[in-house]
Amino acid sequence: MNKPVKMEPGVKLRDAAKMALIPVKVLPTEKNEMLRKPEWLKIRLPKSTERIEGIKQAMRKHGLHSVCEEASCPNLSECFNHGTATFMILGAICTRRCPFCDVAHGRPLTPDATEPEKLALTIKDMKLSYVVITSVDRDDLRDGGAQHFADCIREIRKHSPNITIEILVPDFRGRMDRALEILIETPPDVFNHNLETAPRLYKLARPGADYKWSLELLRRFKEAHPEIKTKSGLMVGLGEEISEIEEVLRDLRAHNVDMLTVGQYLQPSKHHLPVKRYVPPAEFDALKAYADEIGFTHAASGPFVRSSYHADQQAAGKEVK
């Protein structure tokens, strides 16, 4: 039997070190085993990086994190170049160790009580009209970090009263009652929680998470605030069948979820789960058509779509691919 790994607070475990701790063994994918990216997945970099560097400097100045950087999002250059970013609160170390995700695992530090104000002032300085706030999983906190979300929402509204706030929350495992009590009292404008994949793949891709629990979180928030949009996201290319994704879409609608994002899974490193298939654009279009047909108010479906990709346009009902 392996001895438990002693984790020091604040130390980030990534790639092989992180994968060594998950219950399902993931073998490294050698370069010759990786699927070749198709032409539709080639990213065009912007000519100027001035705006990108400006946002990175603003983050560093206030000790803030973006999920764009921490999760190695392929859209970072495009979003930063347009002056948008998804802020990640509660540190950059996650208590979970999902093998599709590039965010570091480890023992997080105590939440920074000054972060809500620093975040609000940064958002005000950036003159944002729409902001997405997400977090790592914080299973070490009694409320899963919900109060910190609420504090951030309150501070942002104080400094930017006309802003639209979307929060992308973890599942608050074992703490749903307390977390919802807090967030129902201090709600965002859009409540987002990602199901990520089909339930058959949860043990592989989302160890520690529960499909029905996540659906219930979305349902209960919507029940308390029917006027607020709820949203969820999925990735494809992990070995799921399209019929399984369609079933997830039906489950989301049955739980009154309004908005949907579907994007291609991209392997962050050779130590993460391998890409089983690159889904062609036509299949993304078909998933969007199906989502529209079954009643989503907005569905963004495309290879580069992520939860917060052009989130302002998604919320406004504009087509995003």
Swiss-Prot record:
Family statement: Belongs to the radical SAM superfamily. Lipoyl synthase family.
Task: Give the required cofactors.
Answer: [4Fe-4S] cluster
Q: What does the entry list as the binding residues for [4Fe-4S] cluster 1?
A: C68, C73, C79, S308
Q: How is the cofactor bound?
A: Binds 2 [4Fe-4S] clusters per subunit. One cluster is coordinated with 3 cysteines and an exchangeable S-adenosyl-L-methionine.
Pathway of action: Protein modification; protein lipoylation via endogenous pathway; protein N(6)-(lipoyl)lysine from octanoyl-[acyl-carrier-protein]: step 2/2
GO CC terms, sorted:
cytoplasm
Classification via InterPro entries: Aldolase_TIM (IPR013785), Elp3/MiaA/NifB-like_rSAM (IPR006638), LIAS_N (IPR031691), Lipoyl_synth (IPR003698), rSAM (IPR007197)
The source's superkingdom equals Bacteria
What's one GO MF term for it? lipoate synthase activity
Please list the residues that bind [4Fe-4S] cluster 2. C94, C98, C101
Protein's recorded name: Lipoyl synthase
Query: Might you give the EC number(s) for this enzyme?
Result: 2.8.1.8
Keyword field contains Iron-sulfur: yes
This protein's record includes keyword Metal-binding: yes
Question: Which residues does the UniProt record annotate as the domain Radical SAM core?
Answer: 80-297
> Entry's PROSITE patterns?
RADICAL_SAM
Q: List UniProt keywords, sorted A-Z.
A: 4Fe-4S, Cytoplasm, Iron, Iron-sulfur, Metal-binding, S-adenosyl-L-methionine, Transferase
Can you state which reaction this protein catalyses? [[Fe-S] cluster scaffold protein carrying a second [4Fe-4S](2+) cluster] + N(6)-octanoyl-L-lysyl-[protein] + 2 oxidized [2Fe-2S]-[ferredoxin] + 2 S-adenosyl-L-methionine + 4 H(+) = [[Fe-S] cluster scaffold protein] + N(6)-[(R)-dihydrolipoyl]-L-lysyl-[protein] + 4 Fe(3+) + 2 hydrogen sulfide + 2 5'-deoxyadenosine + 2 L-methionine + 2 reduced [2Fe-2S]-[ferredoxin]
Name where it's found.
Answer: Cytoplasm
